[in-house]
Amino acid sequence: YFCVRLIIAYQQKKERAAMNVCETMKQLKSERTDAFMHELYGNGAVENKARYEAVLKGFKEAFGDSEEVLLFSSPGRTEISGNHTDHNHGKVLAGSINLDCVGAAAKNYSNQVHIISETYDQDITIDLNDLEPSIKKAGTVDLIKGLLKGFETSGYSVGGFNAYITSNVISAAGVSSSASFEMLVCSMLNTFFNESHMDNVAYAHIGKYAENVYWDKASGLLDQMACAVGGLITIDFVEPMTPVVKKIDFDFQAQNHSLIIVQTGKGHADLSAEYSAVPEEMKKVAKYFGKDVLAQVSEE
């Protein structure tokens, strides 16, 4: 199933041998990686393997070779049931999808984070000494700054790294292209500077912090949790700081069901105020019943 993960490094966790771009490309062409790609992408293994080759080439062209470059993947997500219920400390049924954000990255031993997005034609450099949001509080730069600040305020380490990223997670289609990107960056920061000690819940809270504080968007934890954990899952947000996640073993294809995603061609960048109003309106309803959130209100 899809979840935020390292792609090549999983094969060398025990030995942790450093590999440069050429060596990583060679590993990418191995039979072992072929089997993993087929497990992850099914019939789309060949075309998706080409995406990883492309980001490696893009990384080398942009940043030169590196003593240790790693490949990362983070999927988009879909809500099967439950929308905005995370704001109410309720339950959701969600799943990751086979569209993902992938990237090649390596530490650059500087005080700068340099990210190139092939998909959105962006070349971003952020100084770790300047993580204040812009006046506008919007866009990729603010989001990345929010993630970096979220790591710092949560007691985690950050540092300079280079990344070359591409994504086929459709924007404006309700599959969380932003959360997919957030979890990818969190995975890079965790791997490079925190010895991979962080868990998915920590990722999700940092992604939520970035959107809440640096985008002024009242996001919950659903999107980030679904992208980070992967597969078909239920999440109970009765304790938002420690949501309870359970995986569900169910094959929709075996039941003759397919999920159809439609790219509307219409963004929602101008709807942040309306989006943020939803949890506030729900809390007003809960307050009417003398409660803080709707999960505390009896159905009777």
What are these regions (language model features)?
Residues S73-H89, N168-V185:
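Glycine/serine-rich anion-binding loops at beta->alpha junctions
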Residues I135-V169:
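Helix-rich "cap/lid" substructures immediately adjacent to catalytic or cofactor-binding pockets
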Residues K14-R77, V102, A106-K137, T234-E300:
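C-terminal nucleotide
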Residues E195-P243, I248:
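Alpha/beta catalytic cores of group-transfer enzymes, especially the acyltransferase/condensing modules
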Residues T153-G160, L189-Y203:
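Phosphate-handling active-site elements
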Residues Y1-A18:
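Short, Lys/Arg-enriched N-terminal segments with co-localized hydrophobic residues
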Residues S96-N98, V175-E195:
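DPxDG-like acidic metal-binding loop motif
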